[in-house]
Design a protein with these regions (language model features):
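Short cysteine clusters
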Residues: 222
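The feature marks the mature, well-folded catalytic cores of soluble enzymes
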Residues: 1-219
Length: 222
């Protein structure tokens, strides 16, 4: 984790990046990247709505999928009134639209984006990202620097395996059989005439050590 954080900071430093956007990723949370970058004076903005609300509260996500489910509409309305000066009697739809507009501005001109990855296809070099809000696709499309942080257990052999794994990855998300959007990345894109800088950081974080243990290896099936 420490090596990954240092590597990411070095990448951002060589381009003098001081402001980045981030998408939802449990791996990024695992290595403590955001507090590390903020300690280095790099501003990080969450682009997932729930994670953005948690960031405003200066709290970690309540749930891996629904980050701010522990907050009521009135609590969020009070928060937005304090932070942005909007009226306190906003309904959930108004709050969502206001948040989307804030994040749209952040995603339209980022210096860099950091994402996780749902799957890494080894035989084609494809990075697969799943989402429901559209923030990942927007972020990756505009950022001149894209850093992907993924653990080695995201590696799969063939893209054919996704026919099973993509529906399965949404199995535990309430009221949704499959994710709304998929992004398949096979290399850097061209942004305003320049080729995007794309980095993939593979994280071991003791996974290979756990795999060697007959009983403990089962936790990696979660």
């Amino acid at each position: 984790a420490d090596d990954a954080n240092q590597m990411i900071y070095d990448i951002l430093s060589q381009d003098r990046v001081k402001r980045i956007i981030k998408t939802k990723s449990s791996t990024i949370e695992e290595i403590g990247l955001i507090p590390y970058l903020e300690m280095k004076k790099i501003k990080v903005t969450e682009t997932n709505i729930g994670d953005f609300i948690c960031q405003l509260y200066n709290q970690v996500p309540y749930n891996i999928v629904h980050s701010a489910d522990n907050k009521t509409n009135s609590q969020i309305a009070d928060l937005y009134s304090d932070k942005f000066g909007i009226k306190q009697n906003c309904n959930p739809k108004q709050l969502t639209l206001y948040t989307k507009q804030l994040l749209k501005e952040e995603m339209s001109n980022p210096s860099a984006v950091i994402t996780g990855a749902n799957f890494l296809v080894s035989n084609s070099g494809t990075i697969v990202l799943t989402e429901n809000e559209g923030n990942i696709l927007k972020s990756c499309s505009f950022a001149p620097i894209h850093i992907v942080v993924a653990s080695i257990n995201k590696l799969i052999t063939s893209i054919d395996e996704l026919s099973v794994l993509l529906p399965l990855s949404s199995f535990y998300e309430p009221n949704r059989n499959i994710s709304s959007l998929y992004t398949f990345i096979n290399g850097p894109v061209e942004i305003e005439g320049q080729l995007q800088k794309l980095y993939l950081i593979l994280l071991n974080n003791n996974i290979t050590e756990i795999l060697e243990k007959e009983i403990q290896r089962d936790i990696l099936s979660c």
